[in-house]
Amino acid sequence: KNMYGIHVSDNNVDVVDAVDVLVLAVKPQYYESVITQIKDHVRADQLIITIAPGKTLSWLAEKFGKDVKIVRTMPNTPALVGEGMTGATPNEFVTEAEIKYVCEILSGFSKVEVISEKLMDTVVAVSGSSPAYVFMFIEAMADAAVEQGMPRAQAYKFAVQAVMGSAKMVLETGKHPGELKDMVCSPAGTTIKAVRVLEKE
C-alpha cells in the first residue's frame, strides 16, 4: 500500500465511486452480477476496461443500460512476465485520446493492438489460447531431447531458447516465417526432412 499507493476495498460500489478508470477483471460468469451492482454508480466520464471473452460491446451496453465508455480487451498469459499481447476494441463513446491512454496502461504488461470487434474471437485463438500450444511444442521438443539422453532441465533450456530466438528473428528481421524456415533447411538435410514429417502429420 505504501509503496504503490494501492487502496483495497471489498465493496464494488466504493471502487467505482473512487476511480476514473475501472477495470472489470472478474470471471465472465460474474460480469452480469457485478454490472448490476455498479451500473447506477458508473459516470459518463469514466473509462471501463473489460477483460472477458465472449462479452461483446453490445452485451455490455445492454447490461449497463446507458451510454458508457467501454474498451473491450483480451490479453494473454505471457502478460504475467511482461511479454503479453493484448487486443483492444473501444466503443463509439471512447475518444482517440482515451484509447491512447488505455493502450499506455496495457503496455505496462503487453504489446497492444487496437482492432475491430469482429476480430476479437480471432485474438482469442491466435494470442489468448496459443501460449498453451507453444508450451506443448516446447515440452515435445524437450521430451525428444530427453529420449536421446539429455537431462530434463537442460532440454528445456535448449527448447525454450530456440522458441525465444526464433520469435525474435521474426520480429526483428521482418522476414516472412516461411522465408526464415527456408534459411534453416539445407538441401537433403535433417531439418527439411523433419519439416516434411510435421507437414504430413
Protein language model annotation of sequence segments:
Residues 59-69, 85-123, 135-172:
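Internal alpha-helical scaffold of NAD(P)-dependent oxidoreductase catalytic cores
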Residues 4, 11-88, 92:
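Rossmann-like NAD(P)(H) cofactor-binding subdomain of soluble oxidoreductases
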Residues 53-55, 75-79, 127, 161-163, ...:
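Glycine-rich beta-alpha junction loops
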Residues 71, 120-125, 177-182:
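Short pre-catalytic strand/loop immediately N-terminal to key active-site residues, enriched for Gly-Thr
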Residues 1:
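Conserved SAM-binding loop
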Residues 7-12, 113-115:
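Short acidic-hydrophobic, aromatic-tinged amphipathic segments that line or gate anion-handling sites
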Residues 160-201:
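NAD(P)-dependent Rossmann-like dehydrogenase/reductase catalytic/cofactor-binding core
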